[in-house]
């Protein structure tokens, strides 16, 4: 189940019970009183359709190393277990969680520095919409696509 209060229009989410051909959904509208989410469903065959679902039926789209690599994130060359995304004027690192496969600890690095001692560490994130919220907060014009 997803927390409807954390969602924003444009966030990427997924259904709790996926069916064949379904990939993910893009939030188009929210009604927090009724708990309904209007979303665009995206299918593997490039098809799309509008749908309305209860927030109980939806869940966050999970982050993964493969998804991050497909969006341009890469491991550092010095062998550290950190995925880096370089954006001007900051660098963002994502350290995989020791407890969960889908969770990451974001670190914010000034300029092009990749030393952990220069970083600002943040709370663990688990989904694409949480990472997108951080990127938007830092005013980076980057969209994470599944």
Residue ranges and their predicted role:
Residues 1-2, 140-146:
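Short intrinsically disordered terminal tails
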Residues 2-18, 24:
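Short coil-to-beta transition motif at edge beta-strands of beta-rich domains
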Residues 19-37:
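Short beta-strand-centered aromatic/proline hotspots
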Residues 35-45:
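SH3/SH3-like beta-barrel fold
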Residues 39, 49-51, 85:
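Short linear proline/tyrosine/threonine-rich motifs used for host-factor recruitment
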Residues 46-74, 118-142:
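Intrinsically disordered, low-complexity, charged/polar segments
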Residues 72-102:
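Amphipathic, interaction-prone secondary-structure segments
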Residues 90-125:
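Intrinsically disordered, low-complexity regulatory segments enriched in Ser/Thr/Pro
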């Amino acid at each position: 189940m997803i927390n409807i209060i954390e969602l924003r229009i444009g966030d990427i989410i997924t259904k709790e019970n996926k069916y064949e051909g379904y990939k993910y959904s893009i939030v188009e509208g929210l009604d927090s009183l009724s708990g309904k989410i209007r979303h665009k469903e995206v299918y593997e065959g490039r098809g799309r359709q509008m749908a309305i679902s209860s927030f109980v039926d939806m869940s966050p789209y999970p982050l993964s190393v493969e998804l991050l690599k497909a969006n341009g994130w890469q491991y550092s060359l010095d062998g550290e277990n950190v995925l880096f995304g370089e954006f001007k004027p900051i660098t963002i690192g994502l350290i995989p969680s020791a407890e969960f496969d889908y969770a990451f600890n974001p670190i914010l690095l000034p300029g092009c520095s990749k030393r952990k001692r220069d970083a600002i560490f943040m709370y663990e994130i688990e989904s694409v919409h949480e990472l997108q919220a951080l990127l938007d907060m830092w005013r980076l014009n980057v969209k994470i696509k599944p």
